[in-house]
Amino acid sequence: GAVNEVYDLLVEFENYIVGETIIPIKNTLSGLPGTDISEIERVYSKVEALMQASHFLGEHGDWQQISVANTALAAKKILEDQDKHQAAVCSAYAASVYGLSVLADSINDEKNNSTRFIVITNQKVFLKDAKKISICLELPHESSSLYHLLSHFAYNDLNMTKIESRPMEGKSWEYRFFIDFEGNLADPAVKNAIRGLREEGRNLRILGNY
């Protein structure tokens, strides 16, 4: 799933996406050397990593799951606390950096799990050979507003690859939508679709063409 804080930051700051990379994620359960998995009482990691290992963690329902900023900090905490009742959901690399032992390997629910990272700049750069577009816009709380929004992709034969919604602060039942679709800003079909999207929604922003 998406990391919601990233969407919020894209809106807050005038940054632009210029690239993306997909990195395979293989998390472990790691603890202090000499720890037995039966000793574990508390597990630390970022929320997304805990969710990605929900099946494994669910088999140990008595463990307390505690969220921290990221998986590396979780591993660092285990080292600093020196408590064998604690473990971290983290990569094998993070475990090795902080001198932890892997108690269980490949604990992700999805064995082909990966994370998409975006490359951003504060310059308004749209690459000429780009093939993907990211936008965001706001929709009013009105009947069929989302249907009309999506119709512009179908009408212009554009392949939408992702859509996520975030509630708008201070506006009940109104949402900001983040959409990825294939194309280049120079394409006539893309220009026509964006023209229609501006009419359907509010505050449309092109986040990147990469």
For the regions a protein language model found, what residue spans apply to each?
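Domain-level signature for soluble enzymes in the chorismate/prephenate branch of the shikimate pathway
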Residues: 1-210
